[in-house]
Amino acid sequence: MADFDMVLKCWGPVEADYTTHGSLVLTRLFTEHPETLKLFPKFAGIAHGDLAGDAGVSAHGATVLNKLGDLLKARGAHAALLKPLSSSHATKHKIPIINFKLIAEVIGKVMEEKAGLDAAGQTALRNVMAVIIADMEADYKELGFTE
């Protein structure tokens, strides 16, 4: 619980502008981990330099952060929220678990820069994301999805 609360203390600026922060997160993910872009076929035709200004990238980034906000606010009681996300990402989108670890690190960097998440907050976010990702991985296994 303490980790969730620590992250939520810095969530306000992110929540106030999911679109901008979401664009920053996805653009940075695609820059630092170019292999992740292939997991988003709808962005395939967008030049790398145009990703940051693309409305579709911003909208998807906003969706990611909005869902993460819901998971954070559940403070660990997130099974009902997480199951449908796990299901769609395993069966429809076929997203390997490692990619959630990559985006979690990027979210931490963006929150440090834009929302004041300090070193203790970074550790708290890593702990929170480790729990969420482990639960997703368990859901993936139930669904028979292995990378």
Swiss-Prot record:
Subunit note: Monomeric.
Globin domain span: 2-141
Binding of O2, residues: 60
Keywords: Cytoplasm, Heme, Iron, Metal-binding, Muscle protein, Oxidoreductase, Oxygen transport, Transport
GO cellular component assignments: extracellular exosome; sarcoplasm
Binding residues for heme b: 89
Family: Belongs to the globin family.
EC number of the protein: 1.7.-.-, 1.11.1.-
Cellular compartment(s): Cytoplasm, Sarcoplasm
Domain of life: Eukaryota
Keyword Iron (UniProt): yes
Role of this protein: Monomeric heme protein which primary function is to store oxygen and facilitate its diffusion within muscle tissues. Reversibly binds oxygen through a pentacoordinated heme iron and enables its timely and efficient release as needed during periods of heightened demand. Depending on the oxidative conditions of tissues and cells, and in addition to its ability to bind oxygen, it also has a nitrite reductase activity whereby it regulates the production of bioactive nitric oxide.
Protein name (Swiss-Prot/TrEMBL): Myoglobin
Tagged with keyword Ligase: no
Catalytic activity field: Fe(III)-heme b-[protein] + nitric oxide + H2O = Fe(II)-heme b-[protein] + nitrite + 2 H(+); H2O2 + AH2 = A + 2 H2O
Residue numbers binding nitrite: 60
Enzyme class, broadest EC rank: oxidoreductase
A single GO BP: removal of superoxide radicals
Gene Ontology terms for molecular function: heme binding; metal ion binding; nitrite reductase activity; oxygen binding; oxygen carrier activity; peroxidase activity
